[in-house]
Amino acid sequence: MGASEEMKVLERVPVSKPPFEYNDLKKAVPPHCFTRSLSLSFYYLFYDLIKVCILFYVASKYIPMLPYSLSCIVWPLYWFFQGAFLGRLWMIGHECGHHSFSNYRWLDDTVGFLVHTATLTPYFSFKYSHRNHHAHTNSLEYDEVHVPKIRKFKSEHLYSEFLTNNPFGLVVNMVFELTFGYPSYLIFNYSGRKLTQAGFASHLYPQSPIFNDSERNHVFFSDVGICIVLYALYRIAIAKGAMLVLYVYGLPWVVMSAFIFSLTYLQHTHPSIPHYDSTEWNWLRGALSSIDRELAGAFNIKKTHYHVVHHLFPFIPEYHAHDATEALKPILGPYYKYDGTPFYKALWREMKDCLYVESDDGPNKTGVYWFKTKT
């Protein structure tokens, strides 16, 4: 990417009132994009399940038979690819939570529950909190995850700047976020919004202030599913050995978690997109404050390419997201943002430069906040 092209990528999106309304966008999307195909959805589900099962079988049966020197090469390759394929399955569970898998909500919840539980994600808990993310995207007060800090004084965030403004500190921070970011979010609400209600904020705690009373039974049901999977892994570890469970399931799960954290982080963290406080935020502004990237095309995770349309119309199935995006681009104009920076470069840049947000200085200072990198 040349210097001029990079400058264009980093150019801020407009924050003025767009010349279109939500209904204008909806009318521009081809009608077939809103159609859920049960056969297509199950095709992609079984296609991904077969890949995961084949890799599980090969890893548990054949890789342990390899010479040690060769297994040291094959195991990391397995962890990476299996983690990516588990991430693909996780995305199908995410689709189910948006009711874009089929026309039957009960079927979506059944498939989503089974898939997410198998990947140690509490389905209903995540579904409810993720719904809040879509309802309050890029709101500094009410968004659900990857909520940036507001810098009010120059003395704030000095530790973060020291940590990320040297290569060693940046690597340490990146490894921590990729390894622990997603499970810490589920367990401790790490990187989540600050809740005004008292109580332990966790996706695993039914009485958490994240949820309302009508959702708590489903949260408990999600916990039961997680406990069943953990118990099954425990029994397999007793029968086959803890090391085999770690290698076949545990480390691919860590890779999957890293994929999930990095994908969601990069879709909402970019120098060109704003965050808003309550004085300036509205739903359309928030939905437009995401970015399309080329992050996981090799693994057929198309939602990473078309995240803007996903926030505008989350019920559009991923296999129609391309057509919907192409139809919307002419209308969105400069309000649409795409960044083709390679995954590893984008992650390094954003974790280095997007430390905190603050409003622009000047007499027209508003509730629009941008990522800043300098003290």
Curated annotation (Swiss-Prot):
- UniProt keywords, alphabetically: Fatty acid biosynthesis, Fatty acid metabolism, Lipid biosynthesis, Lipid metabolism, Membrane, Oxidoreductase, Transmembrane, Transmembrane helix
Residues spanned by motif Histidine box-2: 130-134
Entry membrane topology: Multi-pass membrane protein
Give the EC number(s) listed in the UniProt record.
Answer: 1.14.19.-
GO terms for molecular function, please? oxidoreductase activity
Q: Which domain of life is it from?
A: Eukaryota
Primary location: membrane
Report the GO terms under cellular component: membrane
Q: Where are the transmembrane segments?
A: 38-58, 66-86, 168-188, 219-239, 241-261
Q: Which GO terms describe its biological process?
A: fatty acid biosynthetic process
- Per UniProt, the short sequence motif Histidine box-3 occupies residue numbers 307-311
The residue numbers the entry assigns to motif Histidine box-1 are 94-98
**Compartments where located:** Membrane
Q: What does this protein do?
A: Involved in the biosynthesis of dimorphecolic acid (9-OH-18:2(10E,12E)). Very limited activity with cis-linoleic acid (16:2(9Z,12Z)).
Family designation: Belongs to the fatty acid desaturase type 1 family.
- List the protein's name: Delta(9) fatty acid conjugase-like enzyme
Q: Which organism is it from?
A: Dimorphotheca sinuata
Highest classification ranks of the organism: Eukaryota, Viridiplantae, Streptophyta, Embryophyta, Tracheophyta
